[in-house]
Amino acid sequence: SSLPFVKEGVKNVLAKVPAERTVVALPFYTRLWKEVKGKKPHPEAYGMSGAESVVRANDASPKWDEATGQYYAEFKSSGATYKIWLEEETSLKKKLEVVKKSKTAGVAFWKLGFERAVTWTTIADAVRGW
């Protein structure tokens, strides 16, 4: 999810639920969007390592997208355009900063097993002193 989506979601929830009763859930996965002219876009879910493998296998070059707070890559294959906004440690750290500033009761993640081992170091560093 994009950084603005997380910020807006936290803001909307906290308008109705006290921070001390709120746990914010963040994703360990992303979606690869397949776009074919004249057809509805088709998304496919990938964990962090799987998404990185798809990008690498297609020689795509992820670029940091300041607007979304994520790396973005795009490539073409078999007449389709593929787009992916990557969930990885840099984007996760930015989202964790938003959650920490909101002083919620905590944070949760979905889906376990879709993260990389190094992801837990990023999380531990971010929640220290929460």
Residue ranges and their predicted role:
Residues 96, 110-112:
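C-terminal functional modules
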